[in-house]
Amino acid sequence: MAAPSDGFKPRERSGGEQAQDWDALPPKRPRLGAGNKIGGRRLIVVLEGASLETVKVGKTYELLNCDKHKSILLKNGRDPGEARPDITHQSLLMLMDSPLNRAGLLQVYIHTQKNVLIEVNPQTRIPRTFDRFCGLMVQLLHKLSVRAADGPQKLLKVIKNPVSDHFPVGCMKVGTSFSIPVVSDVRELVPSSDPIVFVVGAFAHGKVSVEYTEKMVSISNYPLSAALTCAKLTTAFEEVWGVI
């Protein structure tokens, strides 16, 4: 489970000490709440088409993935390559660990293939191991929220669609795609003081296709994983906004 912290204070660890896999790390600066319609600079990332789906195995539920449940997927006529929750896990690690998030300038939403919309509390620290991540996603999808271990704070919660209802009014909404012929420098897309939404595909194959984006951009001459796309986005915003 998760536990809120009094503050993020780097320190030295002894050789055998391990970091907690799941807890809450408050941003250094106060931030606008998720879904706040007021302006103020921040990057909003939507992980679109995430493969987060539970399957019953015996008497328990597990997070469907291509490695453990290939036979189940094939039996139901589904492509095993589509069941890739690891893509969402890797992307969340990149986003939530970023200095941009620690500075209180990032908000993340996850929209799954099954049309479930998830809000990620900026104070959440994602589990490092995939097995623990899977367990928490199963809990989230069945109970609709994951709370901090020692308080009422919700670190992950299922919210109402559409995701566009949770964006600040009038903000730019940008989709990412390798198929766009002209490559854009992300730093040139960073607004000086306004919020902006970037949509990143959290799937193995295909392209982002949502109705609410106003433009599509390519940010590299090469195909990028979702996690690397997230890393390039947060790094560019950190450089322009002076987050070190």
Curated annotation (Swiss-Prot):
Alphabetically ordered keywords of this record: Acetylation, Disease variant, Methyltransferase, Nucleus, Phosphoprotein, Ribosome biogenesis, RNA-binding, rRNA processing, rRNA-binding, S-adenosyl-L-methionine, Transferase
Site description Stabilizes Arg-84, residues in chain: D86
Cited Gene3D superfamilies: 3.40.1280.10
Binding site for S-adenosyl-L-methionine: T176, G201, G206, I219, S220, N221, Y222, P223, L224
SUPFAM superfamilies: alpha/beta knot (SSF75217)
Catalytic function, reaction form: pseudouridine(1248) in human 18S rRNA + S-adenosyl-L-methionine = N(1)-methylpseudouridine(1248) in human 18S rRNA + S-adenosyl-L-homocysteine + H(+)
Record's keyword annotation contains Cell cycle: no
Molecular function, one GO term: rRNA (pseudouridine) methyltransferase activity
Stretches for region Disordered: 1-34
Medical condition linked: Bowen-Conradi syndrome: A combination of malformations characterized in newborns by low birth weight, microcephaly, mild joint restriction, a prominent nose, micrognathia, fifth finger clinodactyly, and 'rocker-bottom' feet. The syndrome is transmitted as an autosomal recessive trait. The prognosis is poor, with all infants dying within the first few months of life.
Record note on quaternary structure: Homodimer. Part of the small subunit (SSU) processome, composed of more than 70 proteins and the RNA chaperone small nucleolar RNA (snoRNA) U3.
Protein name: Ribosomal RNA small subunit methyltransferase NEP1
